[in-house]
A protein has these predicted regions:
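Short, C-terminally biased terminal segments at protein or domain edges
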Residues: 1-54, 58, 62-125
């Protein structure tokens, strides 16, 4: 049985992409913990990487345009922070080139999408 909320958010690119990205982040953090025995940076990555989708999802039920804009801006900040942690994990050899390139492409895609949403929202004020 599908939830009314799922039906309302159907075909929302930002919701879908940020959720799928959060799943990738959770799986990456499991890998970093289990295979690389890395716990500190991965905890930061888990927090920021899953926060993107949480804020995008929250924005869908914003009480006002200002609330929507604020939540999307927070999601963008979290995406930028996630980019930082991924780059650091790559430069410190916790992520190989292939792993980094794949997930980095996804975070850059999200950053571009969220930037466009924030610009559009701010220009319509």
């Amino acid at each position: 049985m599908q939830n009314w909320r799922d039906e309302t958010l159907k075909d929302n690119v930002s919701v879908d992409k940020s959720f799928d990205f959060a799943v990738r982040i959770v799986n990456l953090c499991k890998f970093l913990n289990n295979e690389k025995k890395e716990y500190i940076l991965s905890k930061q990555l888990l927090r920021s990487g899953t926060s993107i989708g949480a804020n995008v999802s929250e924005a869908q039920r914003a009480q006002s345009k200002a609330d929507f804009s604020s939540k999307m801006a927070i999601a963008l900040k979290e995406a930028n922070e996630t980019y930082y942690w991924l780059k650091l994990l790559h430069k410190t050899d916790y992520l190989n080139e292939s792993q980094y390139n794949s997930i980095n492409a996804d975070v850059n895609d999200l950053i571009g999408l969220l930037t466009a949403i924030c610009k559009t929202t701010n220009s319509n004020k």
